[in-house]
Amino acid sequence: MQRPAFAIAALVLAVGIGSARAADEVVIGALYPMTGPNAQVGADAKAAMETAADIINGNHNVPMLLGKGGGLDKLGGAKIRLIFADHQGDPQKARAEAERLITQEHVVALIGSYQSATAATISQVADRYEVPYMSADNSSPSLNQRGLKWFFRTSPHDVMFTQAMFDFFRDIGAKTGHKVSSVVLFHEDTIFGTDSSNAQKQMADAAGIKVAADIRYRGNSPSLSAEVQQIKAADADVIMPSSYTSDAILLMRGLHDVGYTPKAIMAQSAGFVEQAFIDAVGPLAEGVMSRSAFALDASKARPAIPAVDALYKARNNKDLNDNTGREITALVVLADAINRAGSLDEDKIRQALVATDIPGNQTIMPWKGVKFDATGQNTEASPVIQQIKGGVYHTIYPFDVAAEPAVWNVGK
């Protein structure tokens, strides 16, 4: 790995005080919001990462990639050790923590980080130090379009997710006779919301669907009352929010407070798939739809799901969701590449990531598989659409993998 001169100096100093990596372990840095408004997301991500590491290191014999346990066999049974860092949802804090993990903790790779805005800075640091960054759950499509060599993303991005939404609108309209004619876009003001809205506008235009309102708001706002009034006035067929947890809760409560019941809500995941959201708004969440990369109800096609969910639930007292399913998968894929590299050399790990070709049935995800293109994007990740029924998300699309029929009130 060709590190900058100042980084080499930092490493020499760190090694001099005895913090070199042990040969019997593989140290990976995980960056998440452990404090602040999305602290619960960070806590859940930590539990997911620890579950994945336990599957790899332990003896659970789960029917999935690296599920036999015992550590990484091509590294003599070396165990995965995770070092967690709190970026607090702040891109600059994320930058500093990524650099600390590389220069002081000597991690061989980074993984994270929930908010796409933090991934933008983390991945820049990773590229500068030539250390792989595995994007577990960042969905902004611009992240893999910056010419970075060390960026890899297992999950679909928001263009892929949005395409699934508009495919659903087309197919549910044809199936029921109740077509979507208008949408309201509602999005927070960071790279996540902006990129999501841009993709949705383009696809709405292509589908001949009117964008009745395009509402941009400041993330973690204390109030969304003005924005809720705009949504009510637009009265579109579908509200399409791109919001983190606290904003998702405010939105649903605000709509209820003004007496407005949307015909349909199609969320860009994020806060809408968190148990904290469902718990906070209760029956107001019923019928909410979201794109997802993970389907808990797909255990027939993915037999590892029940075992992995049980291990995660024992640790965190809740089932896997879209975010935690992606986080587990990303760490397993990263660990598999390190194992295939047979080395802690970052360049060899990168080469192994480039060569990744994992069938979907070796994962817990409803994907064709994992294979990265030249930009580091997994091209074989296929989203699903889910809907909350009885406080639980159920897969409703594609129709051939649906566990439940969609409740569709548009046009009624």
Please report, for each region that a protein language model flagged, where it lies by residue.
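Extracytosolic ligand-binding ectodomains
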Residues: 2-11, 22-412
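N-terminal signal peptide c-region/cleavage motif recognized by signal peptidases
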Residues: 17-19
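Short, glycine/charge-rich beta-strand/loop segments that flank catalytic centers
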Residues: 14
